């Protein structure tokens, strides 16, 4: 697992989890704003993403275990956690399974929804286990020798724009320098083409929503108002009745799914207000 830090090593730790098909260096503008406020910001590339190794197994449970391993290796005791999209959902679910792993959780468009999220498309599982395992094995056979299509950095940036249409070309081009590699025949994104989100066994998004009222630590959710393909489609009015009374939910007008990239200073400001001074939570 490739890990990253911003800020002083002896500062109060703050764990940040990126979203699906992203990598930790997408935090290169956002994370320093948190570090400048006195936090030691810690993140990692999920398995198969960025500079972390490709794996034989990709599943929701594997990502959850990786989160716990990284946190326990880097931080002693509870700490605040921030997660975007899939990363937010991972933080929420891990905290529900292991209460007080975190002192509080911030989910940037990553709170549970009745709708299946697009970056965890196969997390909604209702079929029999035999069919699930067969499907997973078939996918591994199809993708065992797959490699990503090469191109120039400009071409890779344009391809990523299909997934991130609201983000500037300059930013997407920058990401090619930290999230892609140069081979003899061109540049390729480092993300494993065999990635498959989800896992085995039944799962419904509603189950996560039903567990929210008993969330064990302070919870802060941020949602944008502009829907896009990678967004989770969570509507604030649908979500509010399921939140704990102490939870905070901010709706950022005019922002899309990648709120912390579109508006890093505003997003960091809202989160820092929620967190308080380093060490208070």
Regions of interest found by a model, annotated:
Residues 213-255:
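Conserved loop-alpha-helix segment in the C-terminal half of the alpha/beta-hydrolase fold
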Residues 1-15, 36-39, 76-77, 112, ...:
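Alpha/beta-hydrolase fold catalytic core
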Residues 261-273:
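Post-His helix in hydrolase/transferase enzymes
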Residues 146-227:
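Alpha/beta-hydrolase
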Residues 4-53:
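Conserved HGGG/HGGXW glycine-rich cap/lid loop of the alpha/beta-hydrolase fold
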